[in-house]
Swiss-Prot record:
InterPro entries: Globin, Globin-like_sf, Globin/Proto, Globin_lamprey/hagfish. Residues 11-150 form the Globin domain. This is Globin-1. SUPFAM superfamilies: Globin-like. PANTHER family: CYTOGLOBIN, CYTOGLOBIN-1-RELATED. One of its GO terms (molecular function) is oxygen binding. Pfam families: Globin (PF00042). Heme b binds at residues 74, 106. Belongs to the globin family. Monomer. It comes from Mordacia mordax. Keywords: Heme, Iron, Metal-binding, Oxygen transport, Transport.
Length: 150
């Protein structure tokens, strides 16, 4: 299932949730490194996205990005937001509320182009559970909610 950022997706089954939790637990064990690796891959593959992060200006190489405390801080926030979504899979109202708040911030305060949510979600999915339809469905749910304020 390709990741989408509009419309709706079917609810996650119990089997999908269990598979997501198992895959995510493995990734989240080293969340700081994983988060930085994901964000570095995102910025090196999508350099235009870096314009939305003034603190990352001048960080032109993967090594520069990895060594930046600002990048590490933001990577941790992203990973923890996904972790919150994984923990909230059984309480979609809670997940929705948190992600809609993030959507408002990104749309109205940071002016982030919403297309980047889908790109980043793809990298997270490929890092966590490559080709897993359930994880891609969760990433779609996250993208749809993050796009809600646009």
């Amino acid at each position: 299932m390709p990741i989408v950022d509009s419309g709706s997706v079917s609810p996650l089954s119990d089997a999908e949730k269990n598979k997501i939790r198992a895959a995510w637990d493995l990734v989240y064990k080293d969340y700081e490194k994983t988060g930085v690796d994901i964000l570095v891959k995102f910025f090196t593959g999508t350099p235009a996205a870096q314009a939305f992060f003034p603190k990352f200006k001048g960080l032109t190489t993967a090594d520069d990005l990895k060594q930046s405390s600002d990048v590490r801080w933001h990577a941790e926030r992203i990973i923890n937001a996904v972790n919150d979504a994984v923990k909230s899979m059984d309480d979609t109202e809670k997940m929705s509320m948190k992600l809609k708040e993030l959507s408002i911030k990104h749309a109205q305060s940071f002016y982030v182009d919403r297309q980047y949510f889908k790109v980043l979600a793809g990298i997270i999915a490929d890092t966590t559970a490559p080709g897993d339809a359930g994880f891609e469905k969760l990433m779609s749910m996250i993208c749809i909610l993050l796009s809600s304020a646009y």
